[in-house]
Amino acid sequence: RPPASLTFVVDISGSMAGPGRLELVRKSLNILTDELRDDDSVSLVTFSDKAETRLPMTRLKGNRNKIRDAVDEMRPARSTNVEAGIMRGYEESVEGHREGANNRVVLLSDALANTGDTKAENILERIDSARREYGITLFGVGVGSEYGDAFMERLTNKGDGHTTYVGDEEQARKVFVDQLPAHIQLRARDAKAQVAFDRKTVKQFRLIGYENRKVADEDFRDDSVDGGEVGPGHTVTALYAVRLREGASGEVAKATVRWLDPETRKAYEESGTVRTGAIEDTLWGSAPQRLQVAAVAAYFADTLRGGDLPGTPALRELASRATKLASETDDDSVRKLATA
């Protein structure tokens, strides 16, 4: 992969002093310092009521101890001014911008802004302009069980990135050893998916989630309209609840995926169709295991939000299905879902 130029923007406000927050951030950044290559570069910005550059853009080679020292010196302070932190972080990222490198801002915060521009308009404008002019993207890491996920997601959506969550050292290793290094190099930029249902066979359909990531039909092939980014080994799942017409037979939907090559910006498209025979069996019967896992997670999340998805099983049944799937898939994340 090309070298990475990463700017870490770390929330050191009072709310980050709670158990498993700032200390976990320190451990996370030290883990990543060990994983990055010698030709990668990092800078470090912290923020509470104001922002401070703790480390300007620094090459990893010969400087790992210097980087660890800057990370270990972080201490919790006062209120949270996310605007100040992100503005300073993007200044550092632009100043340390490297042609041909993957330039990224990594925000680590509980995202509970309480001073500065909490409506985020100034922040969003800055994130968008840096993305367009310099190709700088944003990776958001939520810390703490009460982190402001909706606010964090707004920021990363504008920054052509995505969010993840860290709650313990095991998750930190997964994010900073597996996820972040994989996403330093993109496989697809501004990826979009469109599903067209056939009204002759489909009575009702509903997209589950993605409320703030919907793209208008007329914007699907407009490559100036922001999509999502996909890294190596990264999968994106969109689930639909579908009700067929009685006695329906034939094509149910046509799904199309469109994306840009990260280097050439050339657009590509691929399409596929789904027919009634593919969805005649019950979900819990012969459906692929990963689809069942996704369904359990979606039903569980919708229940927590007070949703009304048709056919939602009771929590006890969801837990039972998750436990069964955990034993069949030998997947640690499914085991955690079963005990959530």
For every predicted segment, state its role.
Residues 46-48, 197, 259-261:
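Residue-level signal for short segments within beta-strands and strand-turn junctions
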Residues 82, 108, 139-141, 206, ...:
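Generic detector of intrinsically disordered, low-complexity, polar/charged segments
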Residues 1-191, 245-249, 340:
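Exposed acidic/Ser/Thr-rich ligand/metal-binding surfaces
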Residues 44, 204-207:
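Generic preference for hydrophobic
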Residues 192-195, 199-201:
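Long, C-terminal catalytic modules of enzymes
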Residues 202, 210-237, 242-340:
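Long, acidic serine/threonine- and proline-rich intrinsically disordered regions
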